[in-house]
Amino acid sequence: MMQKMKKAMLLAPAVALGLTGMGAAPAMADHAEGTYSTTLGEVNNSGATGLAWVEVTGSQATVTIQTKGLAETFKGEPYPHVQHVHIGAQGTCPTMADDANGDGIVDTVEGQPAYGKIGTTLSLTGDTGPTAGTDVAVAPSGDAYTYERTFDLNGATQDALAGGTGVVVVHGLDPANQPAAAAGTKSNLAPKLPLAATAPALCGSLEMMPAGGADTGVTSAEQGSDSGTATIALGGGLLAAAGAGYAIRRNRTSARN
């Protein structure tokens, strides 16, 4: 079943997920240098929580994401959670008011006016461009994980970070816990999958941290070979710093409503 899920998502039309159409070439500018952070808040009543940091040095970025409470399994196997930095819109996270069709789920497309299209795919290996946006084979999986990777950051995403419109979004809801109106609905990205499989579960607007940044508190980034989960450690100092970013994000989101 998981192989079918992977195949379906890999074949999903790129434009449907909201790709920017730009390549993954590294940027030459360093105007986005600094450390950005956010508290990841639940979307679609996912019950999940998380933190994210992006440290930009020159054209390289080191991204760290910690999550817990996500959907754990799909068809009996570890649930893959595609994740991205979305760009080019308001730089905010959607609310249930953005559920345009009233089915009880804010799907990826309905969330785009808030967070925009994919600028960077936060994959475990390989391509980090928008075209890798639905590749679940390189997505972290399970209900809790710590993700960390350093890679060349494209210019469009650097522009978004510098302009305050970069948003981290983690996708994938448990289909069994969704509203009845959406339970039988297929994804508007990959019609062979349930809508919940590609809907956003976590979201956070990235804000630049004070000079010097903060300790991430990551003590382990071990990815389980069977469960797809990883240990998660949230340092107190980092939580405080990320909390400041959350307050800003919440104010920005409230301004939309």
Language model features by range: what are they?
Residues 2-7, 12-253:
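N-terminal leader/targeting pre-sequences
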